[in-house]
């Protein structure tokens, strides 16, 4: 079981992929007319005056801007952003920012008969195009946060009182159902996977519940791993956060993975961090 941002994929340059997608929708999409609140939030984060934390307001804003989009249009929007250059690196697009050493771990597990799941706080419909562009996983093994889906003709009618018609289409409803972090990761794993993982990989406090659940009363040998953001030269690391997580690993029996000390490369040949830039960890 793998977390995504900061575990398999670049987490903050200067912030999360899903929020940068929000900025693109609000500031760069001529087909969209943002509200004053959305515009202020997007401008503040793009200028780095105020990058939001993982709050309910952040989640609400991110979902509202896509309300009414078809699933096909939204996937195309995500894929378009994936093709844009990565702001803080040379030689890499937004959708290519996977940690190569972690992809090697995934490949090794798949080659030895393991089922590999991704369990992330990123919205499921954002997560799938990115993950499936690189990993040979079935889409149902890519688990993220969930938001409402509606039939175009449904309006405000409750789903129990509405029948989907042959001529209808699905659109994004713009409201959160569950943010897949902390204890919510455990609940989602029980509902969607149905068996306890034997390996769990994370990188932050929002993954602790997933690791504890994996290690608790497991009938099989189980291990938990935390990726440390301790590389300040090749990545946008944070020494303080990395050291805090290293200490937590020692106290909880998790295995630390050091970007700085354990990885010969992060993104591969030809990819370099731009001089004079600073990430958002």
Features from the language model and the residues they span:
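A metal-dependent, Asp-based hydrolase signature
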Residues: 14-16, 20-96, 100
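C-terminal cap/substrate-recognition subdomain and adjoining C-terminal extension
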Residues: 76-281
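Short, charged low-complexity intrinsically disordered segments located at boundaries
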Residues: 11-12, 16, 47-55, 71, ...
């Amino acid at each position: 079981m793998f977390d995504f941002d900061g575990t398999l994929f670049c987490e903050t340059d200067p912030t999360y992929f899903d929020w940068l997608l929000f900025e693109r929708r609000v500031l760069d999409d001529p087909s969209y007319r943002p509200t004053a609140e959305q515009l202020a939030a997007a401008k503040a984060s793009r200028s780095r005056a105020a990058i939001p934390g993982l709050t309910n307001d952040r989640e609400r804003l991110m979902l509202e801007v896509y309300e009414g989009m078809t699933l096909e249009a939204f996937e195309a929007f995500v894929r378009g952003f994936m093709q844009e250059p990565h702001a803080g690196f040379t030689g890499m697009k937004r959708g290519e920012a996977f940690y190569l050493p972690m992809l090697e771990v995934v490949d090794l597990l798949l080659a030895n008969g393991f089922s590999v799941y991704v369990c992330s706080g990123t919205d499921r419909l954002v997560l799938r195009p990115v993950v499936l562009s690189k990993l040979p996983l079935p889409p149902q093994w890519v688990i993220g946060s969930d938001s409402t889906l509606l039939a175009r003709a449904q309006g405000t009618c409750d789903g129990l009182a509405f029948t989907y018609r042959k001529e209808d289409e699905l659109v994004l409803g713009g409201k959160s159902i569950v943010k897949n972090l902390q204890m919510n990761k455990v609940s989602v794993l029980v509902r969607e996977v149905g068996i306890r993982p034997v390996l769990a990989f994370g990188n932050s406090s929002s993954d602790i519940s997933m690791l504890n659940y994996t290690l608790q009363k497991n009938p099989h040998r189980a291990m938990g791993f935390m990726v440390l953001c301790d590389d300040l030269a090749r990545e946008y690391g944070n020494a303080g956060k990395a050291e805090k997580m290293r200490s937590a690993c020692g106290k909880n029996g998790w295995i630390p993975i050091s970007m700085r000390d354990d990885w010969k490369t992060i993104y591969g040949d030809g990819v370099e961090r731009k001089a004079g830039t600073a990430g958002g960890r």
